[in-house]
Structure formats: C-alpha cells, structure tokens
Amino acid sequence: MPADDYPVTELTKALIARPSVTPLDEGCQTLMAERLSAIGFNIEPMVFEDTTNMWARRGNEGPVFCFAGHTDVVPTGDVSRWHTPPFVPTIIDGYLYGRGAADMKGSLAAMVIATERFVAKHPDHNGSIAFLITSDEEGPFINGTTRVIDTLEARNEKITWALVGEPSSTLKLGDVVKNGRRGSLTGNLTVKGIQGHVAYPHLADNPIHKAAPFLAELSQMHWDNGNEFFPPTSFQIANINGGTGASNVIPGALDVMFNFRYSTEVTADILIERVETLLKAHELDYDISWIFNGLPFLTGDGPLLDATRIAIRQVTGYETDPQTTGGTSDGRFIAPTGAKVLELGPVNATIHKVNECVKVDDLEQLALCYEVILEQLLC
C-alpha cells in the first residue's frame, strides 16, 4: 500500500483539515470518538468553560493504559509564508504538511489506528485502554487535562500508564522518548520605587537601579548540580518592563517575569525561599507572586519504558534514548496521580513553525510502535 493511502495518513489529514487553534476542537474529538465508539469504547465528553475534553475507555479493570494528547494547535503565523494552506493537508515529497501534522494530530491518528488494530486482534485483552484528549494544551492549560484528572481522581479512577503523543523524536522517529520532565516555576516580581523627573533624582527612587544588583546576583546563582536524569536547574528572565516610554521620567515600578526549570534535586519551596531571601538581603520594596506550572517527574525502568524500548527496537531497528530535556507537557498533570508517564511522537524539527510537516512513513511506523506497546502491556 502506498504511504499516501495508509489509514493513519488519511485520519491525520482529516484532523489537520479541522482548524482547531486553542481552545477550539472543531470536531476533532468527535471524529476520534466515532472511531473509538465503534470498537467498544465508552465516550465521556468533558467540557469545561471554553475547552473540549474527552475521556474514552474500553474495559472496566486495571491496569489502565491511557493514550494522552491534544487536538488544539498553535496559530499558523503568516499564512503567506506557508508553501501550502496550513489547514489543507498536502503531501509533498513524502512529507505531510499542515498545522498540527507533528504536534500532534499525527500522533492522535496513530493512537486511534493502533488501537483499532490491537482490538481487532485482541478483543479480550487484559485491563483497559483509555484516551484522555483535550483542546487546551497549547494555551493556558486551565480547563484541559488538569480538570479531567481532577474528575477522575474524585471518583478514584486511576491511570496505570500514560503515553503522551508529544513529538519527542529529534532526527528520526523514536530516537528519543521523554521519560520525565523538569518542574516549571514562574515568578512575577514588582519592585517598587517613586516616579519622578530624571533631572531631580533626589526626589524620586529608581526601581530599575535598585533591582539591577539583585537581578545580576540572581542570574548568577547556582541552584543545584542536577543528577543522572536531569540537568542542573536553570533560571531565565523572560520579561522586564519599567518606565513610561519617556526619556525624562524615572519609573515608579519595575516588573520582572522569570522562570525556573528545575530538577528533582530541589523543590519549588526551596527556590522560592532562596529568591525571597535574596530580595530581603537587597532591601527591596517588592510584591511577588508565583505560578506553579508543573512538578518534575521521572519514569524509570519498568513495564512502560521496557515496552516502549521493545516497540521502537522492533519497528525501527534501533535503540531509543530516554531523556528529560525540553519543555513541559500535559504529562505533568498525570504523573502526580501515581501514573507512569512517557512521551513518544514524531520528529519535532518543524513544530510551531511555518510549514510544519511530518514524514508520511513515520506516521505508519508510529502507529506500529503504539500497537506493539499495547501488546506488551495488555496481552
């Protein structure tokens, strides 16, 4: 069968054609639900505010294997820079182009196709298969996976293993899987001063001048050494804003946004304590608020990682490399429940970019990998 005609290719194209920019779903989950319902899944839509979510499950017993992912995509950017319209899926030289091709409608299609094949071969499989799908992963992530997990936890419905379809691969399909993620902590700091005329600095109090030594010291601090699974904790200033835009006005306040990506060697509480101790040492007048974006998690050796290694080796012929690098994913909301979480998806070279694309052959291989993982865990 030509790669263009693979069922996974056709389903990916159907999903790409739905312009589901966050928090819109545009019928993607309905399309998936129709396919899953036909093979015995119970479909439970969960709509919270502007976000569409779906919890689908086949089986009533444990262990529970869950495919997790998102139907929403980031905006297209300048459409004139695309080779083809971003929501008109187009195959050129073996690559399928379209917004969401790699992140992550190709993965969603591969999950559905793999599950259809697995159920056809193993209708009486062990345990349960589930899908946790949201339309709010690329956005504020308030009403998506975290709300679904809250609902499941309230009724004591547990996930044993979760496979997130984020584009984990770097150079070729399956060369990297993500078996953990760093924690993410954001600080929003306001340093207070007194606004005034630049010609009369004795009548004002410049918060930029006051904050500069603090920020310099903060940016040079050593937080930890990392460990065998995580790099050292990193600190980055993301935004600074102060002043009125006029050259003759000393600002009355300085706003600074910064972010930590932290390892399991520290906790959010430790980072907060160190920052606030330094603020007090510099005798700054300040307000600060914190946003907890996610705790660090790690899935070590065990059934899920073992099954994934076997699947990638069997389908591609090479060994995968588990890593914890990169940004956060919705896995951070699933892991605190006790579930083991891994991420396996397409090559991430074009995600969020103009002309996002995925290799058509990789979609079929990804579906095969997912199918082998199901066989390893539920047969």
From Swiss-Prot:
Any one Gene Ontology BP term: diaminopimelate biosynthetic process
Annotated metabolic or biological route of this protein: Amino-acid biosynthesis; L-lysine biosynthesis via DAP pathway; LL-2,6-diaminopimelate from (S)-tetrahydrodipicolinate (succinylase route): step 3/3
InterPro entries: ArgE/DapE_CS, Bact_exopeptidase_dim_dom, DapE_proteobac, Peptidase_M20, Peptidase_M20_dimer, Peptidase_M20A
Catalytic activity of the protein: N-succinyl-(2S,6S)-2,6-diaminopimelate + H2O = (2S,6S)-2,6-diaminopimelate + succinate
Key words, A-Z: Amino-acid biosynthesis, Cobalt, Diaminopimelate biosynthesis, Hydrolase, Lysine biosynthesis, Metal-binding, Zinc
Subunit composition and interactions: Homodimer.
The name this protein goes by in its record: Succinyl-diaminopimelate desuccinylase
Gene: dapE
